[in-house]
């Protein structure tokens, strides 16, 4: 009887053991699935919230609804601060007199003319007036087969859209990212129906302008390889639902935009050639490596990465690492503001190099700081202090990023382009507009001159 109890006890223990083993295996499998799902979620979240996420996109930046209602922040200067008025214009187009009534509107007292003083103020106004021009056009069918048509400097030789209207269409399209339908409605509204062109007609007008500007666009592209340096950046750009990329380059004289179906090195090679004699100011995207004579890597990206990790791990010495980099960057930026001589630049570069190496060679950084050192500071060693030595360039790529930001509105509002031709037209026209602004000119007036000539 006793033997049977022992066997039964062993059997129960074996059953219990198998139950707990199966339960552990099931829990281990569930844990593995949860951890795997967590990693996928973290990877997906990191695509939207990382060191390159603009501050305007951070969800924790915005206050709650209750806090927003309690603490409104109106635009402009705070009440009681010094006013800021425009200076008097150099010329005026019209002069008017604002006259007083015979009596005070409040108490009815008679106002004597000899007691009245005057003052000047300036009012800025604008009108959009439709101008319909009747053109009496001479023509002559020559015996040689040529059909000769008379010309006028203020009138396009073909079409019904004048030069000013074409330039306005372009400004509304590119400056405000307006749809062709909205541009058509806008002109129909402000001109009381006198100017009413279909969206297709406006689209065709933009295409003709791009075609006219294409030779000078190609000329700017050919000039890039002869420039001493170029700021470079790229961003995603949908074309017919496919992922293309908008590349933007800023040099001393030009801004150049190209939209390609590639983010690879070949785009740079096609523009600058295999051995570019100048320098590239960019982020640490690897396609920029080993094709230019010198580089300046972007300190804004470096500091943003360090700050992101410091906020993520506030108890680690990544915080100290970020503070050291920020202090060094501020010191270098202040030095460049003084417009130093070449000799002083060479001397200070050695000093700043020692300070950067001291940060790099510190042995007790946490793994997050070491990761930045290994993958950023050491990999691109020699590319962080070029701006100290070479005059005219900055420590970061913010100059180019501010230019490329002008195209983001188009991408967000219009979703990129539906055709390759539309993408090419955008690159051509926007290259000229940004180049004119870069040169201190007004894009509307410059485009008007190009169309007339």
Where are these regions (language model features)?
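Short, flexible loop/hinge motifs at secondary-structure junctions
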Residues: 1-157, 232
């Amino acid at each position: 009887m006793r033997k049977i109890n022992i066997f039964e006890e062993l059997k129960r223990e074996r059953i219990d053991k198998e139950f707990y083993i199966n339960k552990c295996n099931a829990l281990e499998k569930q844990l593995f699935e949860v951890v795997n799902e967590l990693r996928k979620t973290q990877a997906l979240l990191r695509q939207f919230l990382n060191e390159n996420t603009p501050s305007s996109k951070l969800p924790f930046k915005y206050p709650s609804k209750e806090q927003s209602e309690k603490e409104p922040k109106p635009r402009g200067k705070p009440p009681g601060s010094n006013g800021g008025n425009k200076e008097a214009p150099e010329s005026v187009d019209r002069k008017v007199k604002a006259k007083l009534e015979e009596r005070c509107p409040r108490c009815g007292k008679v106002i004597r003319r000899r007691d009245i003083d005057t003052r000047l103020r300036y009012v800025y106004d604008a009108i959009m007036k439709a101008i319909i021009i009747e053109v009496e056009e001479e023509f002559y069918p020559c015996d040689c087969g040529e059909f000769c048509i008379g010309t006028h400097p203020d009138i396009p030789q073909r079409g019904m859209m004048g030069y000013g209207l074409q330039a306005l269409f372009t400004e509304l399209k590119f400056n405000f990212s307006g749809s062709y339908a909205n541009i058509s409605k806008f002109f129909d509204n402000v001109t009381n129906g006198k100017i009413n062109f279909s969206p297709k007609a406006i689209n065709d007008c933009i295409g003709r302008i791009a075609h006219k500007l294409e030779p000078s666009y190609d000329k700017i592209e050919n000039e890039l390889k002869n420039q001493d340096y170029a700021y470079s950046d790229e961003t995603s750009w949908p074309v017919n639902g496919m992922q293309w990329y908008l590349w933007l380059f800023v040099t001393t004289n030009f801004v150049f935009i190209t939209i390609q179906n590639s983010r690879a090195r070949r785009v740079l090679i096609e523009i600058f050639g295999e051995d570019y004699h100048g320098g590239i100011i960019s982020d640490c995207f690897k396609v920029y490596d080993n094709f230019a004579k010198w580089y300046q890597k972007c300190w804004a990206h470096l500091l943003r990465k360090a700050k992101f990790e410091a906020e993520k791990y506030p108890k680690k010495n990544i915080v100290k690492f970020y503070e050291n980099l920020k202090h060094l960057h501020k010191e270098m930026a202040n030095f460049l503001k003084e417009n130093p001589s070449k000799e002083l630049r060479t001397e200070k570069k050695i000093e700043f190099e020692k300070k950067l190496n001291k940060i790099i060679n510190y042995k007790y950084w946490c793994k997050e700081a070491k990761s930045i050192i290994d993958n950023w500071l050491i990999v691109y060693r020699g590319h962080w202090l070029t701006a100290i030595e070479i005059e005219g360039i900055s420590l970061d790529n913010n100059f180019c990023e501010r230019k490329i930001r002008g195209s983001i509105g188009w991408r967000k509002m219009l979703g990129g382009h539906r055709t390759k031709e539309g993408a090419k037209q955008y690159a051509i026209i926007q290259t000229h507009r940004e180049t004119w602004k870069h040169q201190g000119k007004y894009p509307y007036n410059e485009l008007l001159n190009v169309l007339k000539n």
